[in-house]
């Protein structure tokens, strides 16, 4: 049964936001290498896309812009990057980026998210890496997908990652422990199935909301987008 309510969503979002504010430096230090799956993404994009003189990229939940660094190494195109996130500390050394400081989750829940992107043009490439699992509530995740579809040039590409950490016994065990701790502190949380809290290193109070996606749930996203987009590739990596 799906039980997520706005009070729970707000609490989870606040915990995740606090996590990234407090742990930005140590978290970024562990996120310096490209994801293995990005190489396969490039293969899906193809040589024609990567050989263009200019590419526009909308990156939702951009983090440290690792993907753009990786993309720049594999194309000669000039990148026009529109980066959206709520943790500007990650971007202190980044330049030539149109940055939008935005609480994505809150605006998805109050239905204002698309309006914050009005100044962003249609892009050749729209991506959300490491974001979808931080969004509580299925309707909010679908709203993110809809916005990505609406902000992507027809015939171009959308890249999305869905974390499935319940397949990893070590992470699954950590999630169970951290979630039990969170529920002791916040007994009113109404979590959906496969909703978890995860901790971080030695930060006992640092908790972030993470959803572990099932294959069936990912199928739902594919089906939802089927009348507006064609699935090019789907794979497990990292």
Annotated model-derived regions:
Residues 127:
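A conserved beta-strand element that flanks and buttresses the S-adenosyl-L-methionine
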Residues 135-147:
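A short, conserved alpha-helix within the catalytic core of class I
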Residues 60:
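Conserved beta-strand/loop positions that form the S-adenosyl-L-methionine
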Residues 147-154:
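Conserved helix-to-beta-strand junction in the class I
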Residues 130-134:
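Short catalytic micro-motifs in class I SAM-dependent methyltransferases
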Residues 54, 122-123:
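Local beta-strand N-terminus motif with an aromatic residue
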């Amino acid at each position: 049964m799906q039980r997520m309510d706005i009070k729970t969503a707000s609490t989870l979002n606040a915990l995740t936001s606090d996590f990234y504010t407090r742990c930005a430096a140590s978290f970024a230090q562990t996120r310096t290498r490209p994801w293995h799956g990005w190489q396969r993404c490039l293969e899906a994009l193809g040589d024609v896309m990567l050989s263009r003189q200019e590419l526009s990229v909308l990156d939702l939940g951009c983090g440290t812009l690792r993907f753009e660094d990786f993309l720049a190494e594999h194309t000669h195109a000039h990148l026009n990057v529109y980066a959206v996130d709520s943790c500007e500390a990650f971007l202190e050394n980044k330049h030539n980026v149109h940055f939008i400081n935005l609480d994505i989750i809150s605006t998805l829940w109050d239905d204002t998210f698309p309006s914050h992107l009005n100044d962003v043009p249609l892009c050749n490439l729209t991506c959300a890496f490491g974001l979808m699992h931080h969004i509580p509530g299925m309707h909010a995740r679908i709203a993110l997908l809809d916005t990505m579809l609406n902000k992507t040039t027809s015939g171009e590409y959308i890249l999305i990652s869905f974390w499935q950490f319940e397949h990893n016994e070590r992470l699954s065990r950590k999630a169970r422990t951290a979630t039990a701790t969170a529920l002791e502190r916040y007994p009113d949380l109404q979590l959906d199935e496969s909703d978890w809290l995860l901790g971080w290193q030695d930060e006992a109070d640092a908790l972030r909301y993470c959803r572990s996606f099932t294959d069936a749930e990912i199928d739902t996203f594919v089906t939802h987008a089927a009348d507006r987009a064609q699935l090019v590739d789907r794979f497990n990596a990292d």
